[in-house]
């Protein structure tokens, strides 16, 4: 089989590509490309780094640095290129378009049944004007509704907060629950311990 021998590019001199004797004997197999000899032999399988025929480079952006001609503006007014239609044809077309398009009221009847949804409506609470919320210490208070009027009146008549006296608010839980009550809630019967080695 004919093999090609190539000289390293650093040491390459013009015309230094060599081919085997079998390749040189085949007259049809030798082609002159750009002043260099190259043997075209059939290759089987993948060939890595083997030189092929020179390919034209692909232009990704088309022609670069090409001067394009600017369209010449004419001083004539633009004319429509539509052919002139008779009055009869125009009236026929207008009646067809009017009959095919539905009336704007009939187009979307479900829009009239649409109710706009505002999520803030569910988070706003209306209070009577006589209650002043600005006097309440509401920092860190969760959003909740109090059903008891006594608790609401108690909240509305609070004095400004003081570091010595902290009012008990109904939504707060006891910060230090009694240990026996907490432990009694944790008493749960567990299944018996199984020491079998089979499991």
UniProtKB/Swiss-Prot annotation:
The UniProt keyword set, sorted, is: Acetylation, Cell cycle, Cell division, Chromosome partition, Cytoplasm, DNA damage, DNA repair, Mitosis, Nucleus, Phosphoprotein, Proto-oncogene, Repeat, SH3-binding, Ubl conjugation
Keyword Cell cycle annotated: yes
User: What spans are recorded as compositionally biased (Polar residues)?
Assistant: 76-85
InterPro entries linked to this entry: Securin_separation_inhibitor
- Which cystines does this chain contain? none
Q: Name one GO molecular function term.
A: SH3 domain binding
Sequence motif: TEK-box 2, positions: 91-93
Instruction: Write out the residue ranges of the motif D-box.
Output: 58-61
Please provide the Gene Ontology terms (biological process) for this protein. Answer: cell division; chromosome segregation; DNA repair; homologous chromosome segregation; mitotic sister chromatid cohesion; negative regulation of cell population proliferation; regulation of cell growth; smoothened signaling pathway
Query: Position of motif SH3-binding?
Result: 179-192
Where are stretches of biased composition, namely Basic and acidic residues?
A: 7-23
Which residue ranges does the record annotate as region Disordered? 1-23, 58-108
* Post-translation changes: Phosphorylated at Ser-162 by CDK1 during mitosis. Phosphorylated in vitro by ds-DNA kinase.
Location in the cell: Cytoplasm; Nucleus
Q: In which tissues is it expressed?
A: Expressed at low level in most tissues, except in adult testis, where it is highly expressed. Expressed in both spermatocytes and spermatids.
- Give the residues annotated as coiled coil: none
Give the motif span (TEK-box 1): 68-70
Where are residues bearing Phosphoserine located in the sequence? 162
- To which protein family does this belong? Belongs to the securin family.
- What does the UniProt entry state concerning the protein's domains? The N-terminal destruction box (D-box) acts as a recognition signal for degradation via the ubiquitin-proteasome pathway. The TEK-boxes are required for 'Lys-11'-linked ubiquitination and facilitate the transfer of the first ubiquitin and ubiquitin chain nucleation. TEK-boxes may direct a catalytically competent orientation of the UBE2C/UBCH10-ubiquitin thioester with the acceptor lysine residue.
Write down the disease named in this UniProt entry: Has strong transforming capabilities on a variety of cell lines including NIH 3T3 fibroblasts and on athymic nude mice. Overexpressed in animals suffering from pituitary adenomas. The transforming capability may be due to its interaction and regulation of p53/TP53 pathway.
Instruction: State the oligomer form and interacting partners.
Output: Interacts with the caspase-like ESPL1, and prevents its protease activity by covering its active site. Interacts with p53/TP53 and blocks its activity probably by blocking its binding to DNA. Interacts with the Ku 70 kDa subunit of ds-DNA kinase. Interacts with PTTG1IP. Interacts with RPS10 and DNAJA1.
**Functional description taken from the UniProt entry:** Regulatory protein, which plays a central role in chromosome stability, in the p53/TP53 pathway, and DNA repair. Probably acts by blocking the action of key proteins. During the mitosis, it blocks Separase/ESPL1 function, preventing the proteolysis of the cohesin complex and the subsequent segregation of the chromosomes. At the onset of anaphase, it is ubiquitinated, conducting to its destruction and to the liberation of ESPL1. Its function is however not limited to a blocking activity, since it is required to activate ESPL1.
**Name the UniProt record assigns to this protein:** Securin
Report the source organism.
Answer: Rattus norvegicus (Rat)
